[in-house]
């Protein structure tokens, strides 16, 4: 028998139910308020993420031009191929896999496996194919009713001059980001702002036929105009390439041409080079042969090393012992301090002993009594040991630093060494001072040496080397001009004038006779430095630095052949003619008239002038 609840109990229960219902309604209202107002942005963002597909439209990188307007780096159209297996007709998966494999050189079975994964809405087929390949894929799809293959227009970096200036320009990766050279140093400036296309899609990721598209157009990056003159660069690359082949240079060669008064780099080459359009292809035949002879892990390691070697800008990144070219620095410092003058006399005998270590000139030739000028002409080690001793280690180290040989030059290129290898005064004894005075026992970069010699001849100013003269807007208009920078005054102007006279004497009467140019006054200095860290005790670097016109200095050319295998390793014989060829073409190109020049005609040195093969230290 059912019991009837008392009225007061019923009302109490009704109130409880009503309260619970009201609480639930209030909670629901609060939650709805939170969802609609407080969390509206979050859910809107999630919804848009599901309803829209954004396709990036890559921006072109900024263009790079030479000083004389030659296009060095630009962009070319290419196409990236992608597939959406969800959208591909199931009955045509095999046909699509076979056709695309044939066009793209891919594995058909692997493609079919990708296409059979119906959960996938996007898979990459091939990056950056050319127009012909993209057209073949498009024709295949249209002829066979294959849907789900997307052909997206893309952009890739293009170097219209091929190997020209490759070590300076560098290259980009598949994402169009700079990897080396100017492409890396100025990556942020050259990189543009990507565009985007937004397309509506359904819940399964299919593009809606009755959808909308919105587009933000890409913006091209800013461009660069270089100090590099394409004509002078051609002169340097051609002459250096011939020298590398003629003298069987094993460890690449370096050439630098600079404006001595501004620090602007007019040409820079590391030879052999590579093609930045195909940076992973080894262009040095000898290195390529060595790699191809290996297999497995050894081959992969050798290939990586060969690639990194050819990408390396030796002129900026490598250190070397400058040899007798460095005598210009020792001589300039000694003259500037008053430790010696042009007519100070020194004696060169069979050898000289310093703290129990005997030194001799590389050709074992006794020069006898000679002035400082004659010692420079003869590149006499013994005399420069005595000059270094008069200068003293404190002053020597002070000028070494003042010439910028202990710090990066600050050039606007990547991978410059943070410091060179040198002795400080507290670590330098008499033997170290002796060997450093004639260019051994210290290591500097090729660019540091070139910049230091510019300071020797330009009135004593150390100028910061640079390769970019202007920043350009995408339309070619000027954004910023880069002005030359003087780091410091190193020498007195009169010391620099004296050094110019002495350097001309080296070319007229000394070891630089092969750098003479008919109708132009030239100054220079040779060097043949031993590679003390090489397993081959006969390994040498043959170098020469030349400046013209020496009476009104404008252009410097430094040429270094690393490990030549020729009839000699003397820089005055192998590298001086290269400097002469490059400078003569440059002077003519720049419209500098010839004039009568006193002095001897270029002559090949005799055997007595050349260093003996077994010498332990540098000679002329």
Where are the predicted features?
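Periplasmic/cell-envelope proteins involved in peptidoglycan metabolism and beta-lactam response
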Residues: 1-294, 310, 319, 394-404, ...
